[in-house]
């Protein structure tokens, strides 16, 4: 038979089997061809299983790579988030420190101003003690009423009564 005819009509499997029978020349060519066809079919099934397995492995590898990439992205995002959080905390700490220093400076300025006003008040009281008393008397208000400070006592005015003046010379002890 012609090889082109066999390839065209019978297919490659039977053509290869007949070629193998012609090459080996067994005693029972039909039995040899039958075993060869079984073996060929088994080899084809194994090849298909291997290809399916390779496709499955490739798919699993792609899934693993995608999962690995996602984990890397999540780690990168987490690192970025931690850096942003650390930066934000650092900014807050700097703002708190700045606020504390500003509060401290304003406190110092206020205490300095109050000390200066106390000194000037003390100087003013030394020079004009009577004028301050006259201002308090004229206004009719107590020092607590004049003062706007929180916690200053709110006491009512008490009028002093004229009491007889006793001197040490005028009073003598009985003998």
Swiss-Prot record:
**Superkingdom, natural source:** Eukaryota
UniProt xrefs under Gene3D superfamilies: cAMP-dependent protein kinase regulatory subunit, dimerization-anchoring domain
Which processes are annotated in GO (biological process)? epithelial cilium movement involved in extracellular fluid movement; flagellated sperm motility; mating
Q: Where does it live in the cell?
A: Cytoplasm, Cytoskeleton, Flagellum axoneme
> Any idea which UniProt keywords this protein has?
Cell projection, Cilium, Cytoplasm, Cytoskeleton, Flagellum
Chain intervals for the UniProt region annotation (Disordered): 94-134, 152-175
* Its job: Functions as part of axonemal radial spoke complexes that play an important part in the motility of sperm and cilia. Plays a crucial role during acrosome biogenesis.
Subunit organization: Component of the axonemal radial spoke complex 1 (RS1), at least composed of spoke head proteins RSPH1, RSPH3, RSPH9 and the cilia-specific component RSPH4A or sperm-specific component RSPH6A, spoke stalk proteins RSPH14, DNAJB13, DYDC1, ROPN1L and NME5, and the anchor protein IQUB. Interacts with SH3GL3.
**Similarity remark:** Belongs to the dpy-30 family.
Q: What protein does this entry describe?
A: DPY30 domain-containing protein 1
Organism of origin is Mus musculus (Mouse)
Query: Which gene produces this protein?
Result: Dydc1
